[in-house]
């Protein structure tokens, strides 16, 4: 209920001070507004955008190599190539029970 009253207060504040603040930014959720402000502040600093673009491209190339997909040899469906082989829970239980029976 406090959130609703806070929202009403923000709306009335926005209508009162519409000359200096954008209502759309004030009415958005706080995490969205702060992330946009950080991005806008980072891009307004002249030469830092080129460095960031280069780093983003390098990350993209690294991620493509890590997330390569390939056909599964058993089913033929595509899956991540760096994924371990799956084992059926029933088969795993059977293997574990056989090993315990032999140790006695």
Curated annotation (Swiss-Prot):
Question: What keywords does the record list, in alphabetical order?
Answer: Mitochondrion, Transit peptide
Among the GO biological process terms of this entry, one is: response to abscisic acid
Q: Which InterPro entries match?
A: LEA_3a
Organelle transit peptide residues: 1-31
Is Metal-binding among the key words of this record? no
Q: Could you name the domain of life of the organism this protein comes from?
A: Eukaryota
Where located?
Answer: Mitochondrion
Tell me what induces its expression. Answer: Induced by abscisic acid (ABA). Accumulates in roots and, to a lower extent, in leaves during progressive drought in an ABA-dependent manner. Triggered by cold acclimation.
- Which family does this protein fall into? Belongs to the LEA type 3 family.
Q: What is this protein called?
A: Late embryogenis abundant protein 41
Q: Which gene encodes it?
A: LEA41
């Amino acid at each position: 209920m406090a959130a609703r009253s806070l929202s009403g207060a923000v709306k009335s504040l926005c209508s009162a001070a519409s000359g200096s603040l954008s209502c759309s930014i004030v009415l958005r959720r706080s995490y969205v507004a702060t992330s946009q402000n950080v991005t806008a502040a980072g891009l307004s600093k002249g030469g830092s955008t080129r460095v960031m673009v280069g780093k983003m491209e390098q990350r993209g190339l690294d991620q493509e190599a890590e997330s390569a997909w390939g056909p599964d040899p058993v089913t033929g469906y595509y899956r991540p190539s760096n994924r371990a082989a799956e084992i059926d829970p029933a088969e795993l239980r059977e293997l574990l029970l056989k090993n315990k029976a032999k140790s006695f």
